[in-house]
From Swiss-Prot:
One of its GO terms (cellular component) is cytosol. This is Regulator of ribonuclease activity A. One of its GO terms (molecular function) is enzyme binding. Belongs to the RraA family. It is found in: Cytoplasm. SUPFAM superfamilies: RraA-like. Homotrimer. Binds to both RNA-binding sites in the C-terminal region of Rne and to RhlB. InterPro entries: RraA (IPR010203), RraA/RraA-like (IPR005493), RraA/RraA-like_sf (IPR036704), RraA_gpbac (IPR014339). GO terms for biological process: negative regulation of RNA catabolic process. It comes from Yersinia enterocolitica serotype O:8 / biotype 1B (strain NCTC 13174 / 8081). Globally modulates RNA abundance by binding to RNase E (Rne) and regulating its endonucleolytic activity. Can modulate Rne action in a substrate-dependent manner by altering the composition of the degradosome. Modulates RNA-binding and helicase activities of the degradosome. Keywords: Cytoplasm.
Length: 161
């Protein structure tokens, strides 16, 4: 489904929170949305492999990487895993790498920046916890909608159709 965050903000301005404009699109799908699962991990993407192995139909992974752009939390291998398990998208408060490959995958990926240095894979981090970045607090179970204009968050799914 295609989302227009500008229209959604006009219609649901009382029900949505708007994430500060810190992010750019890196995936092949420029519009995505779904129920979020949160994870907090700093320069370590080992936990992301476990989470993206799960069925992601209708889900978006929100990764609080502490805003670090020194190491990429998402690479082509993780993005491909997410695509195979039907995740709608990934939002990374941090960096990605292998951007040419990411752009060819039919999955939404938004992040702050790209860097060629990969993350550690020790599995250090926490999932399904409250995370805060971009002026918004994210809880697993909230609903996120993203496009080239921005990212918005709602506690309940928006009636889009």
């Amino acid at each position: 489904m295609k989302y227009d965050t500008s229209d959604l903000c006009d219609i649901y301005h009382e029900e949505v929170n708007v994430v500060e404009p810190l992010f750019s699109n890196f995936g092949g799908r420029t519009s995505f949305g779904g129920k979020i699962t949160t994870v907090k991990c700093f320069e370590d993407n080992g936990l992301l492999f476990d989470l993206l192995e799960e069925n992601g139909l209708g889900r978006v992974l929100v990764v609080d990487g502490g805003g670090s752009v020194r190491r990429a939390l998402i690479n082509a291998e993780l993005a491909d895993l997410a695509l195979k398990n039907e995740w709608e998208g990934i939002v990374v408060y941090g960096a990605v790498r292998q951007v040419d490959e990411l752009a060819e995958l039919d999955i939404g990926i938004q992040a702050m920046a790209a860097i060629p240095v990969g993350a550690a894979d020790e599995g250090i981090g926490e999932s399904d916890i409250r995370v805060n970045f971009g002026g918004v607090t994210f809880f697993s179970g909230d609903h996120l909608y993203a496009d080239n204009t921005g990212i918005i968050l709602s506690e309940e799914p928006l009636d889009i159709e």
